[in-house]
């Protein structure tokens, strides 16, 4: 397997890659960079038709030209009214009336604020993007999956979804909630042929990962006092990982693709850590 050299690099698949997605349709949120981009690239390589959703414009140069015909980009702020439904309808209009796979990747970090310092705007924004949007996306795709008694949902959560010592309160709560939503959907629709799992990446080479390393949350400055309380945990993980390569977005995407295949037919409702043993600390 050829690994991308950066979060926004072009993925060139080997000639022998398994076309497990032939004839299937996938939706990927947050497709413009990092894990979302890697998922879109890898799913296309596996012959899925992919509808990518992102708030930023998409750079088609990051896809192989041969894959452009199986990729539809829909630009949207998914926190807007009916934006999730419109995104799903864009996929259905582009590729027919089926949705085989939903990958909820889109997320924001926030500023690491603790409970005594989090602002209403930070809380509302982080929870909206990281939890409300994935739930609304699941709500929108499940009727299409129920029609054919088949479908897979993979939610990209985080090690922060099982720990209180990794991120700020808004991000931590949003990812805990997403894991809970994953389990609820898995149990509720287990008899209808729908599987729902979560992957829990640790520190990865992505836009959010680079923001943490630089000491800011992308669009928001970190709460330095609150971040100081979780920084030792990040430092411990970084120290333990010095002898191994960074986790790449492609490696997370490979786990997503595995969970989407029939090889994972009996795997439902799991939270799969992808973190080089960070979750055991």
Tell what function each PLM region has.
Residues 143, 187-188, 265:
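Alpha-helical segment proximal to the catalytic Tyr-Lys
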């Amino acid at each position: 397997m050829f690994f991308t050299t950066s979060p926004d690099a072009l993925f060139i698949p080997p000639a022998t890659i398994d076309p497990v997605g032939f004839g299937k349709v996938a939706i990927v949120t947050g497709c413009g960079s990092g894990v979302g981009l890697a998922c879109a690239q890898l799913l296309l390589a596996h012959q899925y038709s992919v509808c990518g959703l992102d708030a930023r414009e998409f750079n088609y140069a990051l896809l192989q030209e041969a894959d452009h015909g199986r990729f539809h980009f829909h630009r949207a702020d998914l926190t807007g009214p009916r934006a999730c439904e419109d995104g799903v309808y864009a996929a259905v209009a582009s590729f027919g009336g089926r949705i085989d796979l939903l990958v909820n990747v889109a997320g924001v970090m926030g500023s690491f604020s603790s409970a005594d310092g989090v602002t209403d705007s930070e809380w509302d924004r982080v929870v909206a993007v990281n939890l409300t949007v994935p739930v609304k996306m699941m709500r929108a795709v499940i009727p299409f999956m129920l029609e054919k008694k088949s479908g897979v949902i993979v939610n990209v959560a985080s090690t922060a979804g099982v720990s209180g010592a990794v991120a700020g309160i808004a991000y931590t709560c949003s990812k805990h909630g997403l894991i809970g939503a994953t389990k609820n959907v898995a149990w509720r629709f287990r008899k209808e042929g729908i599987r729902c799992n979560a992957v829990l990446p640790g520190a990865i080479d992505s836009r959010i990962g680079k923001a943490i390393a630089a000491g800011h949350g992308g669009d928001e400055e970190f709460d330095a006092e609150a971040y100081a309380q979780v920084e030792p945990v990040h430092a411990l993980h970084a120290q333990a990982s010095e002898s191994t390569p960074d986790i790449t977005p492609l490696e997370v995407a490979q786990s997503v693709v595995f969970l989407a295949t029939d090889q994972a037919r009996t795997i439902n409702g799991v939270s799969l850590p992808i973190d080089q043993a960070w979750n055991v600390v």
